[in-house]
Each structure stands twice: as C-alpha cells, then as structure tokens.
Amino acid sequence: MKTTIILTCLILAIMIISQSFVAKGTKETEAHAYTVLKVYDQFEIRKYAPALFSGVKLKSKGYKESSGKGFRMLAGYIFGNNEKNQKIAMTTPVVMQLGDTTKMFFKVPDGYSIEELPQPNDTNIVFEKQEEKIMAAIRFNGWADDDKIKHYTAILKNALDKENIQHTNAFSFLGYNPPYELVNRRNEIAVELIQYSNNK
C-alpha cells in the first residue's frame, strides 16, 4: 500500500511539473497582437494588428472533421516540409474559420514577408495578409468540440445583437494550447465587426 501511494504521488508530481513547463511554453509563444477596446459582460472588443498567415482550405466541415487534418498540414510546413527544409516557429492562436467551407490559419512570426517565406511543398497551403481589424471575442475553457463551438457562437451572436453591434457573421474558432496541455485551456470564438464605434 505504501509503495502504491509513493508511486501515485511521484506520478502526480511529474505530471504537475511537466504541465507547468508546457504552460510556460504556451505563455512564451508569439501571439497575434491585439488591443482590448471595450469589455462587455460576455465578450470583449479587440483591435488586431495586421499580420501574415499561412492557411489551408479544407473540404470537410466542422471542428472535429477538420482540426486534425488542417493542423497536420500547416504544422508540416513550419516543421520543414517546404522548399528550404526550413523550420518556422509556432505561434498562437490556431484559427479555424468554420462555415460552408473550413479554413485553418497559423500566424507567421513577425519579421517575415511573403517573399522571404519558403514555398510549401504542399500546394494546398497559401499565404494571406490580413489588415488591421476589429473583432468581438468570447472565451471558454476546457477541450473544444463542435457542440461547445456552436454553443458559444450562439452566445456571442446573441450578445452582439443585443448590443446592436454589426458583424460579418463569419465566426472563427481560436485555440491557444497544444493538445498535450491538459489544464487551463483557452478557447475563443471571434467575429469581425462592421463599422464598429467605441462609443457603443
């Protein structure tokens, strides 16, 4: 019995230490910069800086069907599946535009231009420059799935309608954690706003 207790405590200690290192790595990962313009009860308004993204369009719909395939394709590119066998740093969050078609995006680290990026060996991967934009975002914890994404999308949409804030109706899922980070997971649903005024 004593041996079992000791082993259990040892395993728990290892898990806690390993997860603390994972969390530290997540915090230090370059993120898409934004400024919070206004905070509401259920969501906040952000101004995102211009950024360059690598992206891929997926035939499958929904988070469950698309997330694994899209991640593997884009991760392959930044891990060296490109014309120069060049590794590119991971950034956060991973963005998924969910709708009739699904797109996944990784932000390109600051300092790169499209001309400087190595061409992907996978021709499905494209680069996209996104200009400064205003977005509304709602956060939720835990593991994401299609039901949670639909639930929080509906909450955000209803909250925006209640405040008479116009939006594009093109919602995205933002995931901030690697799959091996088990606690304190951060997920968001975001949508670009139309002619937003900070006076609302």
Spell out what each predicted region is:
Residues K2-K200:
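A solvent-exposed interaction/effector surface
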